[in-house]
């Protein structure tokens, strides 16, 4: 009888620990969406413009040379 009670308490304790961990993991995923998949991160990565592409600033071109709104 004592052993059964100890086992039941242990199982309940471990279940509570898992539920707490799962809830905190899901909460941290919502708070830090930028730590998501690498596909999402690659979409957010700014790339430079190649030769012949339309530009507005020198810094947006890979060569840092924007003349008449075209990268050189």
Curated annotation (Swiss-Prot):
UniProt keyword list: Cleavage on pair of basic residues, Disulfide bond, Knottin, Neurotoxin, Secreted, Signal, Toxin
Reported tissue expression: Expressed by the venom duct.
Pfam assignment, any one: Conotoxin
Disulphide bridges, residue numbers: 48-62, 55-66, 61-71
Oxidoreductase as UniProt keyword: no
InterPro entries on file: Conotoxin (IPR004214)
One cellular-component annotation, GO: extracellular region
GO molecular function, one term: ion channel inhibitor activity
Record bears the keyword Cell division: no
Location relative to the cell: Secreted
Propeptide: 23-45
Signal peptide: 1-22
Domain comment in the entry: The presence of a 'disulfide through disulfide knot' structurally defines this protein as a knottin. The cysteine framework is VI/VII (C-C-CC-C-C).
Region Disordered, annotated ranges: 26-45
Chief location of this protein within or outside the cell: secreted
Protein name: Conotoxin VnMKLT2-0221
Family: Belongs to the conotoxin O1 superfamily.
């Amino acid at each position: 009888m004592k052993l059964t009670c100890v086992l039941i308490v242990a199982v309940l304790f471990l279940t509570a620990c898992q539920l707490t961990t799962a809830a905190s993991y899901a909460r941290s995923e919502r708070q830090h969406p930028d730590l998501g998949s690498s596909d999402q991160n690659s979409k957010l990565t700014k790339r430079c413009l190649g030769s012949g592409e339309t530009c507005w600033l020198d810094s947006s071109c890979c060569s840092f040379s924007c003349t008449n709104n075209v990268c050189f």
